[in-house]
């Protein structure tokens, strides 16, 4: 790891708990995703939640649009370990029902639940059962009067919408909540979060909504969330992709890993390759990413195909290889080793060295 580590001053916020996961304050930034199965298909939803948990999801959100879905949620909750957020709109009775079934957080907009007595019923229930709430403002569903006032979604419009909902909870003396102000436009989302970060002390849930497919969505999310996280804004995040939800978790951790905020698993440093490469760098990286998905312990591994940049990268990596003629140089903790790797068997040799280092360094294979 490079000795140059700029300090990111985290925004001060109150701490809440989603199940056993702390959000805000000095807690690690939590990574979450959302199921895209039919919630009433209990078997498929449970399977997807467990797959998300295996790749590191701290929290999983589940849409609960109907009472049938609420009954399914009860069965789902009993079969998984990761905290679950119920995504609820319009019908306050669904929120009350999933609260009975042990939901860990309610994602609602107080403004679309209906009359204040209904909002109060949800808040009172959340308070009694110690369930936090996420206020989720979205540029695509901004209130009609704010659309008319501002002409279009603007940072000020999203802020005003969020503060309206915050005011409702404040009036009901409820402070166990987090807030999001999502937009599909990067600059709109970033500026909205900046304004909100100055206006309230509650934890912020980050996201670029409807970001797009796997590649474009990951790029948009990395740009937008990267700007905010580098400024110390954000306490939990979701990468919204039109892709397998597992990719949302992987991209989320990749963003945090890139900013040295939170690491999970192997951070591969690999060259884009050119005619100087002495072994198949791309194939090596792809194979190792698949083989080492079970590794949680953070580790920097450099895989460079030649001696131009290879030694320099290896010096600041936990483990590294530098391409050579038929055999490649091997570095451990920044020091060149006498042992060399056979280029034809580099994947197997490198995997063995990585697993051996994990076993020595972190036998329990933990995340930080």
From Swiss-Prot:
Coiled coil: none
Enzyme category, top tier: oxidoreductase
Co-factor(s): [4Fe-4S] cluster
One Gene Ontology molecular-function label: 4-hydroxy-3-methylbut-2-en-1-yl diphosphate synthase activity (ferredoxin)
GO BP term, pick one: isopentenyl diphosphate biosynthetic process, methylerythritol 4-phosphate pathway
Protein's pathway: Isoprenoid biosynthesis; isopentenyl diphosphate biosynthesis via DXP pathway; isopentenyl diphosphate from 1-deoxy-D-xylulose 5-phosphate: step 5/6
Its EC number(s): 1.17.7.3
Cofactor note: Binds 1 [4Fe-4S] cluster.
Matching SUPFAM superfamilies: Dihydropteroate synthetase-like, Nitrite and sulphite reductase 4Fe-4S domain-like
Keywords for this protein: 4Fe-4S, Iron, Iron-sulfur, Isoprene biosynthesis, Metal-binding, Oxidoreductase
Binding-site positions, [4Fe-4S] cluster: 271, 274, 306, 313
Catalytic activity: (2E)-4-hydroxy-3-methylbut-2-enyl diphosphate + oxidized [flavodoxin] + H2O + 2 H(+) = 2-C-methyl-D-erythritol 2,4-cyclic diphosphate + reduced [flavodoxin]
Family per similarity comment: Belongs to the IspG family.
Described function: Converts 2C-methyl-D-erythritol 2,4-cyclodiphosphate (ME-2,4cPP) into 1-hydroxy-2-methyl-2-(E)-butenyl 4-diphosphate.
Name of protein: 4-hydroxy-3-methylbut-2-en-1-yl diphosphate synthase (flavodoxin)
Organism: Haemophilus influenzae (strain PittGG)
Gene: ispG
